[in-house]
Amino acid sequence: MPPETPPLTREQIRNIAYAFQESRILLTAHELGLFTALGSGRHTSAGIASMIGTDPRATERLMNALCAMGLLTKENGRFSNSQGARECLVQDSPGYLGGLMHTVHLWDTWTTLTEAVRTGTGVRLRTVEQKQEQWRSAFIAAMHDRAMRQAPAVVGQIDLSNVTRVLDVGGGSGAYAMAFVRAKAGISATVFDLPGVIPLTRGYVEREGLSQSVATVPGDYLNDGLGKDFDIVFLSAIIHSNSPSENAELIMKCARALRPGGRVVVQDFIMDEERLTPSAGTIFALNMLVGTESGDTYTEAEVSGWMTAAGLSGVSRQGTPFGTSQISGRLI
């Protein structure tokens, strides 16, 4: 039996209930460009309000709260970014968390959680093509920020013997495709994603100087073919956006895109049979409830079943350092 969790105190429950306040303060400041406006300087709240086009009194109250949170400092009526804010929240800094703009957009979808639980479906439309341009750019930036940090380790767990062609389905910025071509000389990769995403993909790939090794193909993986003769078809953070039937069909398409001996590799939150671990996956399932038409987090048995039905053999699972797992199957 797993060890019992100590009971939550009244104060801990209140802290959970009010945790949204600090989150909203940070996201509002980020959305307004407050940290970037401060930069490395020292400014009055009135000066910042003038720069970002906000009410002076309300801006001072916001900045005072940011001081209490450790994100700003205040001395003689002038505010500065803390070291952490300078490193992570100022747009030109190397460690800039540009993906937080996607979190700003997630706030809107999460406010619909009560209605989503009542009705069983998210309020928002599923496809990126139906999103506004700003949403799409922020989403891809958020995924890129995380993927660039995680991709080398994730790809490093995959046996690349005899691999020369990789298809990254729904590859977004191309971070994983770029990790594949960097992991082994002679590998070429193709990113398959929606027509509205591909121009963003090309921009990220060009900035990394990998346009000769990473190709792009526009399409909708639910409706279009994926090509053929790939050694690996890779799906990272894809299946959670889809329904079980959509995933079964998608894995079938991926299998058809393989050479004999090739593999489909799925990376995602893979839940236990009780759907309680990993714990991050339980929360992410709600993110899919409010943000997609029919997405979810799935169990190992579900993913393995789709692979077996698609004719893949030797289905196996391995964990990653990031709370996700890889499940792979081979076409014999």
Region spans (language model):
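Conserved Class I S-adenosyl-L-methionine-dependent methyltransferase catalytic core
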Residues: 3, 10-32, 36-42, 50-51, ...
